[in-house]
Amino acid sequence: MKDPRDVLKRPVITERSADLMTEKKYTFEVDVRANKTEVKDAVESIFGVKVDKVNIMNYKGKSKRVGRYTGMTSRRRKAIVKLTADSKEIEIFEA
């Protein structure tokens, strides 16, 4: 987990995450093996901002069925990153 681009997979754009952006909180889907320190370092190095706090949520895979075949969807890990008050905003979310 050395490369920051391996830690952050993609931003999560939902109505709830858009509301959190006003509080300088940004949501990313991250690698399932990444910890809070790796997420913080990745966001700081990629976007050039200062991170105050990182919250992480784990989602287990769901059981899905197609005909008589059953399978599982992939598990996911989501991180909500709060920036410091004096930090600049992340431009990727501005559209």
UniProtKB/Swiss-Prot annotation:
<comment type="function">
    <text>One of the early assembly proteins it binds 23S rRNA. One of the proteins that surrounds the polypeptide exit tunnel on the outside of the ribosome. Forms the main docking site for trigger factor binding to the ribosome.</text>
</comment>
<dbReference type="InterPro" id="IPR012678">
    <property type="entry name" value="Ribosomal_uL23/eL15/eS24_sf"/>
</dbReference>
<dbReference type="InterPro" id="IPR012677">
    <property type="entry name" value="Nucleotide-bd_a/b_plait_sf"/>
</dbReference>
<protein>
    <recommendedName>
        <fullName>Large ribosomal subunit protein uL23</fullName>
    </recommendedName>
</protein>
<keyword id="KW-0689">Ribosomal protein</keyword>
<keyword id="KW-0699">rRNA-binding</keyword>
<dbReference type="GO" id="GO:0019843">
    <property type="term" value="F:rRNA binding"/>
</dbReference>
<dbReference type="GO" id="GO:0022625">
    <property type="term" value="C:cytosolic large ribosomal subunit"/>
</dbReference>
<keyword id="KW-0694">RNA-binding</keyword>
<keyword id="KW-0687">Ribonucleoprotein</keyword>
<dbReference type="Pfam" id="PF00276">
    <property type="entry name" value="Ribosomal_L23"/>
</dbReference>
<comment type="subunit">
    <text>Part of the 50S ribosomal subunit. Contacts protein L29, and trigger factor when it is bound to the ribosome.</text>
</comment>
<comment type="similarity">
    <text>Belongs to the universal ribosomal protein uL23 family.</text>
</comment>
<dbReference type="GO" id="GO:0003735">
    <property type="term" value="F:structural constituent of ribosome"/>
</dbReference>
<dbReference type="InterPro" id="IPR013025">
    <property type="entry name" value="Ribosomal_uL23-like"/>
</dbReference>
<dbReference type="GO" id="GO:0006412">
    <property type="term" value="P:translation"/>
</dbReference>
<dbReference type="InterPro" id="IPR001014">
    <property type="entry name" value="Ribosomal_uL23_CS"/>
</dbReference>
